[in-house]
Amino acid sequence: MKNRKRKQSLYLISTVLLIIAMTLTLTACGDAEEVVEGAITVPDDYSTIQEAIDAAEDGDVIVVRPGRYTERIDFQGKNITLRSTDPADSEVVSETIIDAGGVDSVVSFRSGESENAVITGFTITGGSGNMEILEFEIEGEMREVPSLYGGGIIVLNDSSPTISSNVIKDNVAERGGGILVYASSPTIQDNTIIDNLSTGGGGGVFLADSSASLSDNEITNNSAGRSGGGIAISGEGVSPSSIDGNRISNNRAENGAAFSIFQSNPVISNNQVINNTAANIGGGFYLVSSSPEIRNNDISDNQGGPSGGGVAIYFESSPELVDNLIIGNDADAGGGISVLVDSAPQISNNTISDNRARLGGGLLIGENSTPQITGNDITENYAERNGAGIFIQESEPVLDGNSIRNNEARRDGGGIYTLLNAIVTLSNNIFENNRASQGGAIHVSEGAVLELGDPDDNTYQGNVPDDVHQE
């Protein structure tokens, strides 16, 4: 009798649990159906994605089931949502593949699509770019440039699509291996842009004459034959582009491994710019005739070749570098930052630390540049030759309120080294525990001028072998 009651109790418990499980399953299925209710489904309704787009109208949703779709797609000006079954599930994204098979761009927005044209939750691969003739300023003149643009995605003609939660990988083009944006304003967010190649500029992303928003993307392991392994920016649209909250790492290029910026003034904030390698100039940033705002970024462990391990500022550029961490970068000259050729940046409240170079471990300033350097922590930088903290030549920087500490040069100028017609204005700086063969704090070479207050309001302590060495 007891056994029978026990069996009955177990049966009732099992039945209740089964009912609960079925209820939860039905609820989950109901929620999933609700998400895609009224959607066009591929391959159920149409065998290809492009056929579904052709049949869609503004406001429609197209849901694509996992699979490899070997095709190129064009939104044709339609403000529709194209999505996988679950853009938040990385496994679904990896298994829902649009593959161009090495022909043209994978995805095209070229007909004035708005922000309501959305692509989300796909792996986009196998693109080789569209042949386009676009205009660029070259040597002061607008010229038509035929090229293969936008291996993975191409955005043209004042289009403003939303590109989110995709993996864009293994695409190639002459410009914009992963994404090419020209005269448009897309929102590009939460994507992984990886292993793309540009033989020219913009291995990951190329923005030209555009007002794009790039946020929270992983841009990694892309390559450019010339400039902008991660991101290349040329010109700008109605408003500056915004680059915020991205991780830009392990990219490679001749110049500007992470960023190459030409005649543009984007706002670049809250990014991680880490472990990028330039064969020539600018492991992290290469700026040419540009004045971007670069704020609150982590610019670390980049390699700059001859110049500018972290940031290379060239040719009349006047950026604002504010509140950044510039740490552990390496170059032949200007391990952390190089400022050259008539440039006038505002460099303030940054941590410039643990950078290495032959000349100018922390900063190198030269060729008639006039930077304002205020409130920075310039510490523990190393120079194999001169100017562990800062190397200055033929320029007129103003340094105010900086802490220049614990830098070491194997030769001269532990804190600052000045050379060849440099005129250096110093006020309210702290020079502490810097080391060199001569000029522990400051080395002033023949022909250089040091302008100090009367009395000198800089602070010197513990510099070896001396504070100021004047030739």
Annotate the PLM regions.
Residues I53, R72-F75, D89, S105-G112, ...:
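Glycine-rich beta-solenoid repeat tracts in large extracellular/virion proteins
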Residues C29-E51, A55, R65-R68:
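Right-handed parallel beta-helix/beta-solenoid
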Residues D44-Q50, V61-T81, T85-P87, T96:
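N-terminal extracellular ligand-recognition/capping segment immediately after the signal peptide
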Residues I40, I62, I73, I80, ...:
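Solenoid scaffold repeats with emphasis on beta-solenoid/beta-helix
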Residues S14-T25:
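Bacterial N-terminal signal peptides
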Residues D44, N79-E137, G462:
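Right-handed parallel beta-helix/beta-spiral solenoid domain characteristic of secreted/periplasmic
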Residues V118-R226, A232, E236-S241, N250-N251:
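Right-handed parallel beta-helix
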